Amino acid sequence: MMDFAIFWDWLSFAVRWLHVVTGIAWIGSSFYFVALDLGLRQRPGMPVGAFGEEWQVHGGGFYHIQKYLVAPAEMPEHLTWFKWESYATWLSGFAMLCVVYYAGADLFLIDPNVLPMSAPVGILLSMATIGVGWVVYDLLCRSPLGKSDTGLMLVLYCVLVFIAWGLTHLFTGRAAFLHLGAITATIMSANVFMVIIPNQKIVVADLIAGRKPDPKYGKIAKQRSLHNNYLTLPVLFLMLSNHYPLAFGTEFNWVIASLVFIIGVLIRHYFNTVHKRAGNPHWTWLGALVLFIIIIWLSTVPKVLTGEPKVSASAQVYIASAHFPAVRDTVLGRCSMCHAAEPVYEGIYHAPKGVMLDTDAGIADHAREIYLQAGRSHAMPPANVSQITDKERALLVAWFEGAGK
């Protein structure tokens, strides 16, 4: 019978793969249409109602694209709506949140040293932060502040900074970054689902019926689309950050997250300006570089823990196991030279993925990962540099599978 932990790990991999694929589709189409829209040109003799056009070449063929702000003379029977890329990305992302962070809440979501809570409370708090994030954003956009694009963006940035700070006081550093990305991605996808597509459908229905559409729908959709454009790169950074503990494992992780949003805006501003043929603002790259150097410096400030590391409730069974003393000796001797608060292995300056196995709490909390990486597979240590034996691997398997029995 297949081990459940192995099945769950493959499920996590499959959902992550799906999320990456759908994300590529969404981001690709989004970037393409932003560049296309900004690059449209007008010329004499264009069809009635055409706002602009663009000639493109790709894959050995030529494409002639025209944009209409109102219905063309003959409304096509079929329209391609670009929406499922967004929906599928959010759904697969939420599925991954459930598979990794909710199913493994005691390890990946909750840090007893930050805020002790039960797994159900942590999960409810997670869902609440994601939902409240969208509600606050939407209310701000619909408020009088929404009439000023610049003013709205500045206020939204301050809100994101506050959320980043708050999340680091609720969850693990890794989960805080992931949730900031999830809140931002939810805002982006909800913009498509609840604003952009519905508004576009209203406009299309009016055009088909021969009515003059209200320009406010297009203006609102364009504002939300602009927000999505500028939020894309920070979301990608936040989603990738769980592989780089230097980003989330520092005392100033919330400051790093806040600076990443500015970097993303600077980079997108450069490409938007170039695609619009309105100049070549190289200064944006200099600004992004300076901010990234500041991020590197901030990442060197470790997160200070007060008191002894606390063991999560679900990990107590692994410490109580009769195998634990031998397992501890094995892990300390074979793994902790890298996976420690202060690694001693040459070339390793920070614990890979932030996983520290130099305490009883760290070993017990990461029992499942030790079992999969060093017990059931030979993925760890890399190239077996610490020469862990088959007998020791069998011990790790027996410890995990026998815990609580």
Predicted feature residues:
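Short, strongly hydrophobic alpha-helical membrane anchors
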Residues: 1-12
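Loop-to-transmembrane boundary segments
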Residues: 69-94, 200, 215-234
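Aromatic- and Gly/Pro-enriched helix-to-coil junctions and flexible linker segments
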Residues: 74, 81, 101, 281-284, ...
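Alpha-helical transmembrane segments and their membrane-interface junctions
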Residues: 81, 86-105, 164-178, 231-250
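Long, contiguous internal "core" modules enriched in hydrophobic/ aromatic residues
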Residues: 103-217
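Membrane-interfacial entry segments at the cytosolic side of transmembrane helices
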Residues: 146-154, 249-253, 275-289
